[in-house]
Amino acid sequence: MSYNPSEYWHERGKIYKKNFRYDKNKRLQEEFLIAHLNSIPGSFKSVLELGCGFGRITQLLLTNYSTITEYLAVDISPDQIENAKTLITSTKLPNEVKLDFRVSDIQSLKLDKEYDLVILSEVLLHILPTDIDSIIKKLITFSKKHIINIDWYEDEPPKNQALHNFIHQYEAIYKKYTNPSTTIKRIPIKRKKFLGTLDTKQSIFHVIIDKNPMN
């Protein structure tokens, strides 16, 4: 059985929100993300979210950062975009935001501007290995300064890996297509335990782009 991302996510998008379970790992993911965003000097006013799903991260950012004045949320699934619209329009926001929702995959997406922050949560892990380099190159063109992707990451892929999940070497791929002065960091998402920490196998990858011409 092969994995076709477009077909898979169009079908899964119809039932994703209904089957979604908000657990302690999702909550921890959000806590780590907010803590990390709070550590970034300055503010981000424009945000591009790719693979927004039903709007979980969209809502998280819009309710926590009143500096955001423009937000574009994109997803491959028309059903998920409708879910995201419903969630956000029913959410009280701290300020007025220019909001736009768009149905598109990343490969087909065309934009006429760059965004302060490009963010993806559990999206790139579903990109085929043959496509990941071209996708990351597009992310770099979309971003004015920051790219953040939150994804499953292990040193070695598990034996029973699902057909729609892939481990990519994000740091190495970002490094290939950015200036040497670009900052690339990985923040493992770990849960505290009584005698230490438990790795959730997820990480925040943060790229701070230097767009000066490469020598």
Please name every model-derived segment.
Residues 119:
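A conserved beta-strand element that flanks and buttresses the S-adenosyl-L-methionine
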